[in-house]
Curated annotation (Swiss-Prot):
InterPro entries: Papain-like_cys_pep_sf, Pept_asp_AS, Peptidase_C1A, Peptidase_C1A_C, Somatomedin_B_dom
Single GO cellular component term: basement membrane
Pfam families the UniProt entry points to: Peptidase_C1
Name of the molecule in the record: Tubulointerstitial nephritis antigen
Biological function: Mediates adhesion of proximal tubule epithelial cells via integrins alpha3-beta1 and alphaV-beta3. This is a non catalytic peptidase C1 family protein.
Organism the protein comes from: Homo sapiens
Site (Cleavage): 49-50
Length: 476
């Protein structure tokens, strides 16, 4: 009985081999040479697959450790095959050309390559010759049965996300769909937008809050708890490099509300600044915060409701739709109705000249607690875009080629409070709470926490604030 089975199995195998030989001879592949080159490929299920010298690895190109993403349909076997270093140990589900491509590529003459008549494969799907697909920030064209991809560095990098999330850095990273598909270059070009502070700004005298030095500062402080309804949450600058305008308008709005004791609680319009602050003419193309504060002092802004953000920041008709004139008694009035005609109030809000707050942590805390949120100029690096939750500190990429993945640029945000947390090792970790301008889906509801007291990402280097210009008639 057992012998009978053996004969059956044997004859089955011989038929299989014979059929494969027939098949291959039709395709003019030198089976003989392949067999003598390495006999180990003759073992078990490997045999059947090994004789198909397909395009898998050539097209998908991954020969690293087990990579579940690097899988493709193996047509002949109606199965999935992998193309990665795991195949060194476990061969049953490896792409047929794993060895030839990843281990012995040079020995293969180019004429053995064509197997599929035309086109390329990706995730088990066939694409015509000349097809273009997008892979994150790169586009790949199927040409000569291979995907040829552009080599941009992408803003979202899974290795970096993984590195942050596996490490003990105090924060976690996420893949944001709004950044997926952008190059690193474009991320820095479109999502930040504050010019490095001018020497004039940096040489400003530092003011210290008038609170006595001995004031007890709480462990935890959030501006929106102390002044509910008077402070303003993060907006989304989208692909408009204008953090210079978003942070300035937001700090000014909070401070006018606090100073007027809730009489004027409108958020101020960053679009008004972007479109009308003429010296920053390329509003979505970065600007300086000195000019923003100058504009708030000299011209004033209407509310965000009156002059909302344009849907398409790249629209060419992005001209200034608001003007103000002086009434001769130190107040300015709008000369045009609101661009958003549903909003009737086109009141102009103005500020005092800005002042610099000391970089001393305690001084910054006193200033926020006494007068409201402040503007902070920070240096943003590539990992910051991935921030999801926790206390941010810069994580240096461990990638060997990390130079090309690194970038650094100035950004402006709003500090709204602080706190203390016990770290994983039980140590005390102090943080600032800051509002970014990347919408509420980013970070902690649009906010982030960042290490406090160690000048992380230069967050304490330049702190700016201003007073609202309220006349006696404005006083509540
Ligand atoms: C065949 O491949 C195995 C595993 O890749 C290798 O260890 C062996 O040296 C190869 N033999 C020949 C003759 O190339
Ligand atoms: C990241 O998100 C995008 C869009 O939401 C998605 O298409 C992509 O597969 C994700 N990438 C990773 C590595 O998770
Ligand atoms: C905006 O327009 C410029 C020039 O026309 C272009 O280079 C850029 O990619 C556009 N940005 C977006 C986000 O569409
Ligand atoms: C910061 O200012 C406080 C007083 O407000 C002072 O006690 C402290 O030493 C200063 N810290 C530094 C680093 O200068
Ligand atoms: C913060 O760091 C920057 C750059 O390292 C430095 O220029 C600046 O003086 C530092 N500021 C403080 C307050 O330590």
């Amino acid at each position: 009985m057992w012998t009978g089975y053996k004969i059956l199995i044997f004859s089955y195998l011989t038929t299989e081999i014979w059929m494969e030989k027939q098949y291959l001879s039709q395709r003019e592949v030198d089976l003989e040479a392949y067999f003598t080159r390495n006999h180990t490929v003759l073992q078990g299920t490997r045999f059947k697959r090994a004789i198909f010298q397909g395009q898998y690895c050539r097209n998908f190109g991954c020969c690293e450790d087990r990579d579940d993403g690097c899988v493709t349909e193996f047509y002949a076997a109606n199965a999935l095959c992998y193309c990665d270093k795991f195949c060194d140990r476990e061969n049953s589900d490896c792409c047929p050309d794993y060895k030839s491509f990843c281990r012995e590529e040079k020995e293969w003459p180019p004429h053995t390559q064509p197997w599929y008549p035309e086109g390329c494969f990706k995730d088990g799907q066939h694409y015509e010759e000349g097809s273009v697909i997008k892979e994150n920030c790169n586009s790949c064209t199927c040409s000569g049965q291979q995907w040829k991809c552009s080599q941009h560095v992408c803003l979202v990098r899974s290795e970096l996300i993984e590195q942050v999330n596996k490490g003990d850095y105090g924060w976690t990273a996420q893949n944001y769909s709004q950044f997926w598909g952008m190059t690193l270059e474009d991320g820095f070009k479109f999502r930040l937008g504050t010019l490095p502070p001018s020497p004039m700004l940096l040489s400003m005298n530092e003011m210290t809050a008038s609170l006595p030095a001995t004031t007890d500062l709480p462990e935890f402080f959030v501006a929106s708890y102390k002044w509910p309804g008077w402070t303003h949450g993060p907006l989304d600058q989208k692909n408009c490099a204008a953090s210079w305008a978003f942070s300035t308008a937001s700090v000014a709005a909070d401070r006018i509300a606090i100073q007027s004791k809730g009489r004027y609680t409108a958020n101020l319009s960053p679009q008004n600044l972007i479109s009308c602050c003429a010296k920053n003419r390329h509003g979505c193309n970065s600007g300086s915060i000195d000019r923003a504060w100058w504009y708030l002092r000299k011209r004033g802004l209407v509310s965000h409701a009156c002059y909302p953000l344009f849907k398409d920041q790249n629209a060419t008709n992005n001209g200034c739709a608001m003007a103000s004139r002086s009434d001769g008694r130190g107040k300015r009035h709008a000369t045009k109705p609101c661009p958003n005609n549903v909003e009737k109030s086109n009141r102009i809000y103005q500020c005092s000249p800005p002042y610099r707050v000391s970089s001393n942590e305690t001084e910054i805390m006193k200033e926020i607690m006494q007068n409201g949120p402040v503007q902070a100029i920070m240096q943003v690096r590539e990992d910051f875009f991935h921030y999801k939750t926790g206390i941010y500190r810069h994580v240096t990429s461990t990638n060997k080629e990390s130079e090309k993945y690194r970038k650094l640029q100035t950004h402006a945000v709003k500090l709204t409070g602080w706190g203390t947390l016990r770290g994983a090792q039980g140590q005390k970790e102090k943080f600032w709470i800051a509002a970014n301008s990347w919408g509420k889906s980013w970070g902690e509801n649009g906010y982030f926490r960042i290490l406090r007291g160690v000048n992380e990402s230069d967050i304490e280097k330049l702190i700016i604030a201003a007073w609202g210009q309220l006349t006696s008639s404005d006083e509540p």
